[in-house]
């Protein structure tokens, strides 16, 4: 029986496992490996940070995954040899017929001097806990949010964070004593969508949040609580950063990043195949021309699933093309959610129309999560 090994049970890995369960459950053995015991939507961290949700309430245990033909194993990958498709974990060794690397991106906070010592982030659940504790003690002052490197996961997330922070400070009666300033190395919040960028910039301005595009924080001075940029230094009482992203160490050591831009895994942009036969990469670790976001990993998984199904059945490869399509919901605060519906690769140029914030889209976002939980874990 054909064995498919999927490394990583995030958006891409879970969607791929679901697709293969639907198409080749009787013809292939699908092994899904992840070091964690549970899945968490990235946007759920905002619920923990700002909406009173507990960490346990937003975790979905992998033990609940009962997809036909799919076996979940909680293991940590220690080495990958893409030439032989040999994978070693802390518990097992594998040599599958097809290997899919969906291990996402790790964070490198130490890449920005001073950030580890004097900064906060909300991209990891541990970072959320530390920032929540800091906010509980916060009584006002200067808040800086800096995007410390590109690319990074979920491009709207820095702006969602400050909009929700604004709401919290208003509720607590602290907004009048707090300044909020966003610094980004990019020229606009969402470069592919002028409509979305305009909506976010206007939302910041309406709330008195300063926005400085094209400005990178390259270091913090922890003793002086000062952020350094080429245009000068800025004082802060609370610094929140979007840390540098990179492939996990085990992926870098495998040689899969050779030929990929900026240290990401080199892939065929149509099929997500790597230069190594039978090896594919999807999601945040792949050097595909789309943002790092779960919806694009989902779309990549569907593309790769069609290719793998043909491999399993020994039929001609289908004429597939990764489209880079996905809709991202954006928190604007006040219970309103907007949406950008992007298509990067189907046509001659990317298109990404924006849908204005509404309570209806907030309900749609909740159903987005519920539908995926049903699909990925129970079918």
Feature locations, PLM:
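Beta1-alpha1 glycine-rich phosphate/pyrophosphate-binding loop at the start
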Residues: 1-71, 149-191
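C-terminal auxiliary extensions adjacent to catalytic cores
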Residues: 338-379
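A Rossmann-like FAD-binding core segment of flavoenzymes
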Residues: 29, 70-87, 170-262, 316
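FAD-binding beta-loop-beta segment adjacent to the flavin cofactor pocket
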Residues: 263-279, 332-344, 350
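FAD-site-proximal beta/loop scaffold in flavoenzymes
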Residues: 114-139, 233-299, 306-310
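Local beta-strand N-terminus motif with an aromatic residue
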Residues: 2, 96-97, 236-237
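Internal hydrophobic alpha-helix adjacent to the cofactor/substrate pocket in enzyme cavities
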Residues: 167, 297-323
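FAD-binding core/adjacent interface of flavoenzyme oxidoreductases
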Residues: 70-160, 164-173, 240
């Amino acid at each position: 029986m054909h064995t498919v090994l999927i490394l990583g049970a995030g958006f891409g890995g879970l969607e791929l496992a679901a697709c293969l369960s639907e198409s080749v459950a009787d013809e292939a053995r699908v092994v899904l490996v992840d070091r964690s015991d549970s899945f968490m939507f990235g946007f759920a961290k905002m619920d923990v940070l700002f909406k009173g949700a507990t960490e346990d309430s937003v975790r979905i245990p992998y033990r609940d995954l009962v997809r036909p033909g799919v076996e979940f194993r909680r293991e940590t990958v220690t080495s990958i040899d893409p030439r032989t498709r040999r994978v070693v974990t802390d518990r097992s060794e594998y040599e599958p017929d097809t290997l899919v690397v969906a291990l996402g991106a790790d964070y490198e906070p130490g890449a920005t001097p001073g950030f580890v010592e004097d900064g906060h982030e909300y991209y990891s659940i541990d970072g959320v806990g530390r920032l929540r504790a800091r906010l509980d003690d916060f009584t006002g002052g200067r808040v800086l949010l800096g995007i410390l490197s590109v690319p990074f996961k979920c491009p709207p997330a820095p702006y969602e964070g400050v909009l929700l922070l604004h709401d919290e400070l208003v509720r607590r009666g602290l907004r009048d004593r707090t300044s909020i300033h966003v610094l980004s190395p990019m020229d606009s919040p969402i470069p592919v969508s002028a409509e979305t960028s305009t909506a976010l910039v206007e939302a910041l301005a309406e709330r008195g949040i300063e926005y400085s595009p094209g400005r990178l924080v390259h270091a913090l001075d922890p003793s002086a609580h000062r952020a350094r940029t080429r245009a000068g230094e800025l004082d802060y009482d609370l610094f929140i950063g979007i840390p540098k992203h990179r492939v996990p160490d085990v992926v870098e050591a495998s040689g899969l990043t050779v030929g990929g831009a900026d240290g990401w895994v080199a892939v065929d942009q149509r099929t997500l195949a790597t230069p190594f036969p039978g090896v594919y990469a999807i999601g945040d670790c792949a050097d595909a021309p789309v943002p790092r976001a779960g919806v694009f990993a989902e779309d990549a998984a569907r593309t790769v699933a069609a290719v793998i199904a043909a491999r399993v059945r020994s039929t001609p490869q289908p004429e597939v093309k990764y489209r880079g399509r996905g809709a991202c919901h954006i928190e604007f605060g006040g219970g309103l959610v907007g949406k950008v519906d992007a298509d990067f690769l189907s046509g001659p140029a990317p298109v990404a129309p924006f849908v204005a914030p509404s309570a209806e889209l907030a309900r749609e976002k909740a159903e987005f999560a519920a539908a995926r939980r049903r699909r990925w874990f129970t079918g």
